[in-house]
Amino acid sequence: MHQKTPLRVGKGLPRLALCAVLLAALALSGCGSRQTHEEYLIPKGPAVGFESPEFFTEHLAPRNQDLQSWREMAPTVRKSLRYVKSKPAVAVAIDRPGLRLTWGDLERTLLRLQELLPRLDAEPQLFLQNFQWVEVPSGIAYSGYYEPRVKASRTRKPGYEQAIYALPPDMKQYKRRHKGRYYTRRQIEEQQLLAGRGLELAWAADPVDVFFLEIQGSGRLVFDDGTEAFINYAGQNGHKYKSSGRIMREKGLLKRGDIFEQRQWFKDNPQRVREILNENPSYVFFRYGSRGPTGAMGHVVDEWLSLAVDRSYIPLGTVVAFGVNVPDEKYGSLPLRGIGFAQDVGGAIKQRRIDLFCGGSERANYVASHLDAPGPAWVLVAR
């Protein structure tokens, strides 16, 4: 689970001309036999716009999601299947205007996709022949999340002064007495109300890194002795999240307020870091974990495949065809058409909003930090 700043969904995005645009796979390095991002670049391809399922499928390829074959999607499909099979098949998973599905419908869809995976490389038209494409009205607002890496020490020392706290044992009882709220970020950081209680999991080099770790909800600590450890979300203090980007825009400090712009401002203005961060009262606590980012299904999320959704709008276990033009350092923007799986949620993800898990590489950091774009989406339902 993770926190993200809500995005505005417009009435729609204009139909984009079918001009030649470089198409990339968003491949990441360091993933076993997977190829690198550069090896996946295709010379030409249309930008993503509001388009028909037929046009979408024509330009759909597994390499877009760092896969050499659709077969490699099988482990992700199995994760969703385990989840939906735990639900009563006849129970309603979603019932809203334009979409009513039972858990059995979701299971049937996943089983059909699993059955087709060996054939899809040669027969992509099977996506159209075997599934109904239920379009999400007015499209989706897309953003991204990733697995951050935070420099840390197991002990406090010069250069490592920012505490990363475990869940306080008194928080549940305190919340009962104070309308569901614990200490604010300002109280925790300025008044040091948790210091000296043995809750420090580690000490980070940069408070800004820890702040963005809270937004993502999980990541890796890279210790000064060369070791690493997974760190996962354990709980939140009950106060409403307010994004630092919004705070800085309201103060006239930034125009856009994306994460890269924020980081540069914090680097240039270290004396004001606490002032800005403490205006967000929300605070996240952590625990050490044995694996990477874990979604709402209880399984590790998969890069370019796992989607965080509002489960009241798109239920967990849903197969989603999604399209968005993603930011790219070299080319500015590259089209991504993919098949995704609703496997995670986030506190600020509401209705027509999807958060794409981008992985743990530098490229994942760049895409997730800059992605803020509209695009089409369809819920796939087995015919």
Regions found by a protein language model. Name each.
Residues 17-27:
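Bacterial N-terminal signal peptides
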Residues 5-7, 25-27, 40:
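N-terminal start and proteolytic maturation junction detector
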Residues 31-383:
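Solvent-exposed, well-ordered loop and adjacent helix/strand elements within mature globular domains
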Residues 1-11:
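N-terminal secretory signal peptides that target proteins for export/translocation
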